Structure formats: structure tokens, C-alpha cells
């Protein structure tokens, strides 16, 4: 009787143990998660170039690898009962975390250049009052914050009565920004430019060029200023030209990956794009919402309905 009562219990335990053996897809998920954690540590340690490459290329690749492992797990779960197993729950939780945090930008990217500063004084790149569509250190006001190359980048456009265009904004000419002169925020040497790309109609954009027509100025060693989405044919410069602060470098356009005319501008620590670290760009002697600012970062609008970015213009 004693043997008879123990054997079924022991059999059930062995059966459950066999049923919850860790399948190869679960083991693969565990290995991938371990690599994913190490990759995030490299990013968070702000190691410069290694962290940039891991953030730009490594994390998305790991996030993408979670998809085939997930499909593998689904197939094994459907065709190999029992469906509910502790090991499978762990496996699916891991691939979900990898896929989500590897593919969805969640917070400002940590960079070794966060404390960078310079003696160069940067002026605003336009002559009258414009609205800051995106700018500042926080993700809530600056969607650029999740991207290494333009972590502290800005988008600007002029507005009238809260609108960036007249009528319905169906044509480029209806946007107040289109054709407006853009000036150099600081003196520098032209090291790269693009001037021949088309301007797209509003709500359309290039699928091949991010920056569109643009100018890159080498302000000082390891400091490169990018001004992007310029109007076709508006750049009056050639590579090697020396540009003085306040000189015209182009006109606002809608080239590249821009759904409506605006100016994008940022600093980065090397010429290569997008494999670079953004540098904090602070402007000097400007007016923000009617208040004089000696040095600061104009703040963009939040995602809340009716939100407005700071209205900024050159100071005296």
C-alpha cells in the first residue's frame, strides 16, 4: 500500500518536471536577454564611441532578434502541451522586454558629452521671432532627445497667431518659414553641404535623405554645426568657405525627412552622421517669450493639445 501511494505522486512530480523542461527557445531568450543587459550597461556607462554604436545599432538588432524567438516560442507552445509552463512565461517575458526596450525610445540617450561646454557664443540662426517646435534637455519638450547625434537639437519655425502657415497650409508658399533666410550661429568653415535636393510638398517627405539640403560648419576642433531641411538652391556656399557669424548660409525649406518647412539645427562631436554624439547647444543673448536670456536652451512645445514652444528672437 505504501509503495502504491507514493508511486503516483512521484510519477506526477517527474511528469511535471519533464513538462517544464526549459526548451531551446527559452534558453535562447535567456542568452539574448543577458547580451541585452550588457549592451544597455555599455550605453549607460557613456563610453563614447562604443556606447554610440551599441545605442544606434546594437540595441535595435537585439530588439529585432526577439521577434523570431517569440515566433519560435509561439509555435512550441501551440504544438507542445501543456501550454502553461513557468519556463515559457519567463521566456515570453524576456523577449517582450528585449523587443520593447530595444525598439522603442523611452528616455533621453545618455552621452559622454552631457557636460560639454565651449567659449563660443552661438546666436539664433534667424533674424526675427520664431517658435521653438522642439528644444531643450527634456524628452517632453524635445523629441530629438532619444537620438545620439542630435540629443540637444532644435526645430524652429516662425508663426503668426499660433499658426505656422496661412490658409490651409496646402502649399509650401503658405508656410511662413519657407524661403526665410538662415544665418550662421557662429563662425566656421564649411566642411559639407547639400544644395540640390527637392523640397517636398507639406506632409510629404524624403525616404532616402534625413537632412535634405544642409550645411555643416566646423566651428572648432570636434565641434560641427548642422543646419538642415534647407530650400533647394538656397545655399550660397562651397566646401572650404569661411563663414562669419550672422552670414547667410541658406533658406528655410522642406527637403529631407521633414513633413513641413522648418529649420533643424544641432551640434555634434564629429563629422559623421548619424554616428556621433550630440553636443549641448546653448544660444547667447536672445529673447524668449519677451524675457532676455543671456545663455540658454529654448524650450519646445510639449505633446499636450494647444501647447506652444518658446517664442525666441535675437537680442539687442
Can you say where each PLM-predicted feature lies in the sequence?
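Internal/C-terminal transmembrane anchor helices
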Residues: 83-110
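Flexible, gly/ser-rich surface segments that form the specificity/activation loops bordering the active-site cleft
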Residues: 194-205, 247-263
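Membrane-embedded alpha-helical segments of integral membrane proteins
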Residues: 30-77
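Short histidine-centered loop motifs in beta-beta connectors
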Residues: 223-246
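Surface-exposed, glycine-biased beta-strand/turn segments
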Residues: 101-212, 307-316
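Membrane-anchoring/interfacial helices and their immediately flanking loops
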Residues: 1-46
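A structural signal for short beta-strand/turn segments enriched in small hydrophobics and glycine
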Residues: 188-190, 240-252
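Acidic, glycine-rich catalytic/binding loops that coordinate metals and/or anionic ligands
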Residues: 209, 241, 266-316
Amino acid at each position: 500500500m505504501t509503495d502504491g501511494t507514493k508511486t503516483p505522486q512521484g510519477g506526477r512530480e517527474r511528469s511535471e518536471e519533464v513538462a517544464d523542461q526549459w526548451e531551446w527557445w527559452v534558453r535562447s531568450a535567456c542568452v539574448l536577454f543577458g547580451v541585452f543587459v550588457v549592451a544597455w550597461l555599455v550605453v549607460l556607462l557613456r563610453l563614447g564611441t562604443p556606447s554610440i554604436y551599441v545605442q544606434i545599432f546594437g540595441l535595435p538588432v537585439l530588439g529585432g532578434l526577439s521577434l523570431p524567438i517569440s515566433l519560435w516560442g509561439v509555435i512550441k507552445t501551440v504544438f507542445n502541451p501543456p501550454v502553461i509552463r513557468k519556463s515559457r512565461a519567463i521566456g515570453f517575458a524576456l523577449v517582450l522586454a528585449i523587443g520593447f526596450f530595444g525598439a522603442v525610445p523611452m528616455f533621453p540617450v545618455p552621452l559622454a558629452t552631457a557636460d560639454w561646454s565651449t567659449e563660443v557664443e552661438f546666436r539664433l540662426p534667424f533674424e526675427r521671432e520664431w517658435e521653438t517646435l522642439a528644444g531643450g534637455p527634456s524628452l517632453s519638450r524635445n523629441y530629438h532627445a532619444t537620438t545620439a547625434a542630435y540629443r540637444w537639437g532644435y526645430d524652429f519655425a516662425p508663426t503668426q497667431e499660433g499658426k505656422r502657415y496661412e490658409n490651409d497650409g496646402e502649399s509650401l508658399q503658405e508656410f511662413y518659414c519657407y524661403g526665410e533666410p538662415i544665418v550662421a550661429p557662429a563662425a566656421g568653415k564649411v566642411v559639407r553641404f547639400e544644395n540640390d535636393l527637392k523640397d517636398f510638398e507639406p506632409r510629404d517627405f524624403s525616404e532616402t535623405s534625413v537632412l535634405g539640403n544642409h550645411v555643416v560648419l566646423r566651428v572648432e576642433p570636434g565641434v560641427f554645426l548642422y543646419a538642415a531641411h534647407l530650400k533647394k538652391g538656397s545655399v550660397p556656399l562651397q566646401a572650404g568657405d569661411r563663414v562669419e557669424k550672422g552670414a547667410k548660409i541658406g533658406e528655410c525649406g522642406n527637403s529631407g525627412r521633414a513633413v513641413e518647412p522648418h529649420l533643424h539645427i544641432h551640434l555634434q562631436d564629429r563629422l559623421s552622421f548619424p554616428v556621433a554624439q550630440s553636443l549641448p547647444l546653448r544660444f547667447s543673448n536672445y529673447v524668449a517669450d519677451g524675457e532676455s536670456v543671456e545663455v540658454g536652451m529654448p524650450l519646445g512645445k510639449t505633446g499636450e493639445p494647444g501647447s506652444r514652444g518658446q517664442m525666441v528672437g535675437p537680442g539687442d
